[in-house]
């Protein structure tokens, strides 16, 4: 084969292999002598776990947590106070404050203006492991309903 012809092909092949484009670049024609270059994909970013200090929640995570909190306080019926029936002095007892097992109102963002029945927000006592007392049905200081 003529060496001049192969030199021309070699130059053309070198030019073809230098065509940029990365992953989705132009397809190299093997018949023309082009050699595909090794493609370097960008490194996959590792997302930190929720227990990591570098973890930042996505909007989806925030929405999921928000839905869980809303469901916790709105889907379950709130407990009401007990009314006394068939008990001696029932009318007097019903006029008094009666105990409610769980805190019937949320402890965060308590609407203090609208609620004349509850003069101050309910106290949620911290237990030994730091969970709010409403999880354990513990009674607390101001959980009374009229």
Curated annotation (Swiss-Prot):
Entry keyword set: Capsid protein, Late protein, Virion
This protein's GO CC annotations: viral capsid
UniProt main location, coarse: virion
The keyword Cell inner membrane appears for this protein: no
Keyword Hydrolase: no
Compartments where located: Virion
Inducers of expression: Expressed in the late phase of the viral replicative cycle.
Superkingdom in the source lineage: Viruses
SUBUNIT field: Interacts with the major capsid protein.
Role this protein plays: One of the minor capsid proteins that constitute a network internal to the major capsid proteins and outside the lipid membrane. The minor capsid proteins glue and stabilize the capsomers.
Protein name (Swiss-Prot/TrEMBL): Minor capsid protein P5
Gene behind the chain: A526R
